[in-house]
Amino acid sequence: MTISAVTGGTVITPGGPARADLLIDGGTIAAIGDEGGTIAANEDHGGPGGQRLDASGCYVLPGGVDPHCHLMPGVHPATAAAARGGTTTVLSFTGPAAGESDLDALLRNRGELERGGAVTDIGLHAAIYDPERIGYDELATVKRAGAAAIKIFLAYPELGIMCSTRRLYELMRAARGLGLLVQVHCENAPLIEALVEEGLHAETRPASAGGGADRELFHPGARIFADTRPPEVEEEAVARTLAAASLAGADCYLVHLSSAGSVEQVRLARRRGQRGVFAEVCTHHLLLDNTRYAGADAERYLVCPPLRDRSDVEALWEGLADGTIDTVGSDHCQVKSATTGPLAEAGHCYTYGLAGAGPRLPLLLSAAAARGLPIERVARVAAENPARAFGHYPAKGALAPGSDADIVIFDPDGEAVLPGDGFGDGTGDSVYAGLATRGRIRAVLLRGQLIVSDGVLTDDRRPGRYLPAAGGAA
């Protein structure tokens, strides 16, 4: 169904909330006018067959932009779930096959996306699993392929993907010259290895690592996992990444920050005048804490970095409120990787995230309202800032003339309970199942097409497109 006008709602524009009507033409926003003015009065809303969508009593938000997903291969289930949850643009990391180079994975994944299959629009980040073998020429091809960013891992030596500090600096220098943003997974792998080898348990854990929860109640495997990836291993790697970026004169994007100390590192860097620092948190670190590791189902919540103490959760929300945190991603992982067996028991985890592409925006809107966080701040961290960081603004992440008509109609007085299947994301399990949310997403538009109505997909054509970042190939 083509929508050519959205009327009667409170529109969250780049300048703030406004009672206004939107005119849509050719999949983009043609005009924003005063509520009840000429847009609402005009019966010819932008073209034949277009219908008016009444948003009375609702907020009209830009479609969500999820900056952090692991979807490849097979994007349909997760993008369908994302759409049902109000996300219209998903940015996914590449997924190399066995023996495939990082560059070949990007080009193959791009080809898959260009053939269609996604419900939302979707862009790519180039994950670098072989940092020693990728050079300037390959990075230039990454840029031309439409990726706005590469991702470096300071962890996972057991998988052979860890990047040294020297190589991180060298890649940052190269990326700077190409206009590529460098994303970094910040954990100090040698420290993790030492803690794993020691078999550190709760009774010997240093107090400085944080211990607000009663760790004696933790499931043994989860306790070992959390104790061998304490906040210090993240915070040290954050400081090291910020130093490397400063010396390289490069922009950096810190993925899934989870601790109070990491948030403070970002504040300190900005106070020193360091520019081009982007800080991300993920839904699970905002909504869940490490008391989940006390349950019989503790393994469901194993994620890197692990869930933290309640004090860390509060610090993340403070960073979200004061602008230290720029973006909120889901870190959606389409396949629950190995979290059992000898390696998991030794403290290793290969789950990059938790299934959450669908619940991300409903959870964030609900929790933010409960904390008194303005809805325009939610729109900024869930849509505008991710679009800006990765070269998709203002086509995405904004409700303004010329922007894509990616729109969410959100009823703040509605209520919903999150489904157990994660909005049908294909994983068959959601750690957010049964959580009640304040507010309800009534409708979702992608480029002016109604794709979700009251939680139900209305368009089975899989209309999503591959989305190259600005400066990449069209």
Predicted regions located by residue number:
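Alpha-helical scaffold segments that flank or form the walls of functional sites
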Residues: 72-124, 129-148, 165-177, 236
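Divalent metal-coordination and catalytic microenvironments
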Residues: 9, 22, 27, 57, ...
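N-terminal metal-binding scaffold of metallo-dependent hydrolase/deaminase domains
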Residues: 1-42
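His/Asp/Glu-enriched, well-ordered alpha-helical/loop segment
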Residues: 223-249, 300, 321, 326-328, ...
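Histidine/acidic residue-rich metal-binding segments in metalloenzymes
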Residues: 134-328
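Short, small/polar residue-rich loop motifs at catalytic or cofactor-binding pockets
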Residues: 16-18, 47, 437-439
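C-terminal cap of metal-dependent C-N hydrolases
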Residues: 342-346, 401-467
